[in-house]
């Protein structure tokens, strides 16, 4: 559940930080938290000569609001990260006030449909500042609200009726620094890549009675100063995705999953039903090749982890399993391709590729 990093082993110093959630222990200020861990990983990666960074927020369901503001501050000089508003109250702008920047180089953020809450805040802020390119699902989960929980057992003295349960209610909404809410709409990726859930209904918008999307006044912020032509980089990535046979197969798989899930009429005739099963089995086998995909990339742990791997077989096995997963990760592969574009050709000039 903690942040950790890895390095892609090739000519370019492209690094990856995986952040599974925005964790903090408010009862113990000296304990590990997401901000200090990410900051430490950045320092270690820079010591290895990092040229570009991928921050992986896929499946990150959120966490501490404080840590997301602090982590956002690692990538900008200073400024607002998110706005919060309660009913009948003025908006509150939460800002990074530290002028130091821990990483000012190329940054790509990976998201998916399960990136929610604090993950959306960070991705949205970096997108609004034009500080990072967001790659992933069509949109993130779309949870732009804050809930509080009241233990009803504490409300009733001398309760003899058993567990009274809890009462959960929404108290606030998050807003991007550009004024738009992340509620329902989430964060729309700059480069949309298909996955098996692309056409499946999920997210806050698919829950019962979700609060609507709205917008408020934008915060006062300044775009990140950079010579990078982000739109050209985004267009190049989109072109790669459009021409990728693997991405086409992933999209076909997603449409097939949607078709199967949407079917609600089944024939009672055995031969018709059996024919349908065989067709589904045949179609399913067409997508099995996706499991065998290899990017050709290799990943390695940082030097500080090597002694840990020697002394802890479980830790070593977990790292090796993660690296094997990254080698098959077509989305990570494209994120690293974008980093290469940003590093070698930030102004978006035409590239001439020489082949032997």
What are these regions (language model features)?
Residues 1-2:
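Short, well-ordered junction/capping motifs at the entry into regular secondary structure
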Residues 5-155, 324, 328, 340:
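Cleft-lining beta-strand/loop regions that shape enzyme active-site pockets
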Residues 18-21, 57, 111, 169-173, ...:
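Flexible glycine-/small-residue-rich
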Residues 26-31, 151-164, 312-315, 319:
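Low-complexity, polar-biased intrinsically disordered regions enriched in Pro/Ser/Thr/Gly
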Residues 68, 73, 95, 141, ...:
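Short, functionally important structural connectors and interaction interfaces within domains
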Residues 130, 137-202:
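Polar, glycine-rich mid-to-C-terminal structural blocks
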Residues 176-352:
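Conserved functional hotspot residues or short segments at active or partner-binding sites
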Residues 354-356:
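Short, solvent-exposed mixed-charge patches
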């Amino acid at each position: 559940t903690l942040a950790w990093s890895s390095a892609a082993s090739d000519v370019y110093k492209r690094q990856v930080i995986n952040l599974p959630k925005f964790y903090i222990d408010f009862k113990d200020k000296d304990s590990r938290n997401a901000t200090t861990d990410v900051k430490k990983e950045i320092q270690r990666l820079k010591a290895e000569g990092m040229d570009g960074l991928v921050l992986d927020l896929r499946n990150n369901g959120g966490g501490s609001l404080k840590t997301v503001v602090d982590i956002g501050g690692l990538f900008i000089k200073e400024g607002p990260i998110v706005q919060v508003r309660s009913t009948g109250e003025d908006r509150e702008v939460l800002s990074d006030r530290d002028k130091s920047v821990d990483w000012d180089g190329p940054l790509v953020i990976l998201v998916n449909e399960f990136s929610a809450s604090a993950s959306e805040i960070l991705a949205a802020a970096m997108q609004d500042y034009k500080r990072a390119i967001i790659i992933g699902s069509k949109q993130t989960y779309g949870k732009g609200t804050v809930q509080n929980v009241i233990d009803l057992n504490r409300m009733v003295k001398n309760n003899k009726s058993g567990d009274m349960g809890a009462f959960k209610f929404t108290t606030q909404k998050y807003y991007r620094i550009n004024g738009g809410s992340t509620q329902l709409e989430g964060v729309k990726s700059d480069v949309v890549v298909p996955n098996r859930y692309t056409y499946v209904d999920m997210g806050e918008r698919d829950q019962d009675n979700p609060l609507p999307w709205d917008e408020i006044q934008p915060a006062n912020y300044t775009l990140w100063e950079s010579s990078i032509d982000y739109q050209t980089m985004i267009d190049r990535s989109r072109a790669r995705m459009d021409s990728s046979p693997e991405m086409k197969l992933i999209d076909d798989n997603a449409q097939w999953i949607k078709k199967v899930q949407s079917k609600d009429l089944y024939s009672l005739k055995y031969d018709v039903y059996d024919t349908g099963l065989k067709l589904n089995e045949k179609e399913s086998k067409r997508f099995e090749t996706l499991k065998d995909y290899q990017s050709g990339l290799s990943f390695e742990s940082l030097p500080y982890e090597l002694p840990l791997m020697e002394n802890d077989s479980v830790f070593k096995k977990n790292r090796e399993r993660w690296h094997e997963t990254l080698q098959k990760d077509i989305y990570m592969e494209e994120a690293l391709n974008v980093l290469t574009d940003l590093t070698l050709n930030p102004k978006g000039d035409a590239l001439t590729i020489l082949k032997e």
